[in-house]
Amino acid sequence: MGREFLDVFTGWAESYDSFVQGQDAEYKEVFRRYDEILDEIVKRSGENVLEFGIGTGNLTKLLFDSNKQVFPIEPSPEMRLIASKKLGENVDIHDGDLIDFPKPTQQIDTIVSSYVFHHLTDDEKYEAIKLYHSLLPVNGKIIFADTMFQTEEAFQNEITKADQANFIDLRDDLKREYYPLIPVIRSHFEKNGFSVSFQQFNDFVWIVEATKL
C-alpha cells in the first residue's frame, strides 16, 4: 500500500521543497513545470477534495487558497510536521495511505494527488481505483499527477538515459517504485466505471483525469 517507501521520505522531508523547485539536477526534468502542474490540478478540482500523500502541503495550500474544502492524508510523520507548519494549526492532517485511510466525514467530489500513485503496485492501483469509485458521486473526479509512461520501451529508455547521465538516484528510483504504463492505468479506470483522459506536462509527468460515469 505504499508504506514500504516511508523511509525514503523520512530522509527527504526537509529537502523536498528544494527538489520540486528543480534544485537537484537528477530530478530537474521530473519536477519541470511543477507549479503549473499543481495549478492545473486545482483548476480541475471540485469544491470538496480528498488529497492523498500531501507531502509538505504544497498542493494542499493551493487548494485551500482557492477556497476548496480539503481532507488531507499523509503517512509520513516528518512530512506531516512540515505541512502543519505551512498550513497552520487549524488544519487536521490525517495519517493514512492510498488504500488504508480515515474516510472523510462529508461527501467529496474530487480525489487528488501529486507524485504519489506510483507507490502502489498495479494490482493495488486497481483496488484503490475501485475503492475511490465507491466514495465519489456520479461525475465525481479523480485527478492525479504522476510519472507514467506510454510504453514499456519508453520506460526502459528513461532508465537507460538516467544511467548514461550517471543519475544513479533517479535510475534506482525508476527501478524501485511502480511507475505505471498509461494503457494499464486507462484499463483500470475504465473497468471500474470511469471515463479517463491523460495530458503530458514533461518527459515524466502526466495528469490523469477520471470522471465517474
Where are the predicted features?
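Core SAM-dependent methyltransferase catalytic element
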Residues: 192-213
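Conserved class I S-adenosyl-L-methionine
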Residues: 1-44, 46-55
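A conserved beta-strand element that flanks and buttresses the S-adenosyl-L-methionine
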Residues: 112
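A short glycine-rich, Lys/Arg-flanked "PGG" loop and its adjoining helix->strand segment in the class I
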Residues: 126-138
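Class I SAM-dependent methyltransferase SAM/SAH-binding core
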Residues: 55-100
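C-terminal alpha-helical "lid/dimerization" subdomain adjacent to the S-adenosyl-L-methionine
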Residues: 145-192, 197-199
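Short catalytic micro-motifs in class I SAM-dependent methyltransferases
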Residues: 115-119
